[in-house]
């Protein structure tokens, strides 16, 4: 952002969503590292690795200096964005609200599989007003809004999809096999997880105001900003399913959140790119975001560039987030169009964003 005002940046963001003619992609620096603890070292280190996290432990106070640093360094980057904050995204908030024990890890926190009796999801029927983790989330969000004082937008934290939540409750193998075998209990469980997620988002939207008359999402990996309302969706459990199971069981639940916002975007890992055709055949998500995952945890970028081009050629805005080395950056410029493209590289220092300059001879590739 640097010297630019947010108001001067908005037209380029809207051009991305419209897939209007542009000379370069929408560029957003993600400063601080791939993992939550890398962005929030002081706050995360206030806990002990292995600690069983309690709602009283997750408070803004320990994270204040981290948020201030993130706000400052994102202002220094010469890009098209600014800092967007949310309650610490290293906490698996939805899983905690649903009753999973949360433990502190080296780079983030993780939810322990609760081994819920799959035939009884009745314990997921509760009043959020009586849920300690939900109240913790609301308090953290309200405290962050007060701390931000209008300097940066605040959004809901990462809330994984109902498939991810069900896997946290019962284990991914149990959920996948139940879907394959057509067990009725798994759809009841997924529906209840989806309903709780929806209720949490509705309550958060009620306490989070618009920012300068606009809306932003992305206090975690990748960001989106628009004059319209916007919501984020993640369903990493799709990695253990197939296109039909996803389309039949998880995609209908994703549509339940449509009344929450005008613009919806979904996060995908390279292991979930088989979903692209199902997503392009549906209008649930206006934008598709793809993680450029760590080498070794995903195929080389060259192997899935055709899938990225397929998204662009279908007329869907594409958002890319991850660690992008020089050779991958050259490949993206050769193969993709800047039209309807947002690139958000992970960098260590604000000045590193200068490495991501776009050649202006490939606008017709999309």
Where are these predicted regions, by residue range?
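Active-site loop segments of alpha/beta catalytic cores
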Residues: 1-52, 66, 70, 76-87, ...
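Outer-membrane beta-barrel proteins
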Residues: 59-60
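A contiguous, low-structure linker/loop signature
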Residues: 84-122
């Amino acid at each position: 952002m640097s010297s630019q005002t947010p108001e001067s940046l908005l037209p380029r963001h809207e051009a991305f969503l419209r897939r209007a003619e542009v000379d370069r992609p929408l560029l957003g620096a993600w400063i601080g590292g791939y993992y939550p603890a890398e962005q929030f070292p002081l706050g995360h280190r206030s806990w002990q690795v292995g600690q069983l996290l309690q709602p009283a432990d997750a408070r803004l106070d320990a994270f204040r200096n981290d948020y201030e640093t993130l706000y400052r360094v994102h202002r220094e980057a010469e890009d098209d964005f600014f800092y967007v904050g949310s309650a610490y995204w290293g906490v698996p908030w939805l899983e905690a609200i649903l009753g999973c024990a949360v433990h502190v890890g080296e780079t983030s926190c993780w939810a322990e599989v609760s081994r819920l009796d799959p035939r009884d999801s009745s314990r997921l029927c509760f009043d959020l007003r009586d849920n300690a983790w939900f109240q913790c989330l609301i308090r953290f969000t309200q405290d962050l809004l007060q701390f931000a004082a209008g300097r940066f937008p605040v959004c809901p934290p990462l809330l994984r999809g109902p498939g991810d939540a069900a896997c946290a409750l019962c284990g991914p193998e149990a959920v996948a096999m139940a879907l394959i075998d057509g067990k009725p209990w798994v759809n009841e469980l997924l529906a209840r997880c989806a309903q709780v997620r929806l209720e949490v988002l509705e309550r958060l939207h009620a306490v989070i105001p618009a920012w300068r008359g606009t809306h932003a999402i992305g206090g975690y990996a990748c960001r989106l900003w628009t004059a319209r309302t916007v919501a984020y969706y993640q369903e990493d459990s799709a990695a253990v399913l197939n296109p039909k199971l996803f389309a039949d069981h998880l995609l209908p639940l994703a549509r339940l959140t449509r009344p929450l916002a005008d613009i919806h975007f979904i996060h995908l890992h390279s292991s979930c790119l088989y979903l692209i055709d199902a997503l392009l055949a549906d209008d649930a998500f206006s934008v598709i975001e793809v993680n450029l995952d760590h080498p070794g945890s995903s195929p080389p970028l060259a192997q899935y560039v055709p899938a990225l081009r397929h998204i662009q050629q279908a007329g869907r805005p594409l958002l890319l987030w991850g660690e992008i080395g020089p050779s991958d950056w050259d490949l993206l410029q050769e193969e993709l169009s800047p039209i309807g493209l947002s690139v958000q590289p992970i960098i260590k220092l604000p000045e590193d964003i200068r490495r991501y300059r776009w050649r202006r001879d490939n606008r017709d590739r999309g």
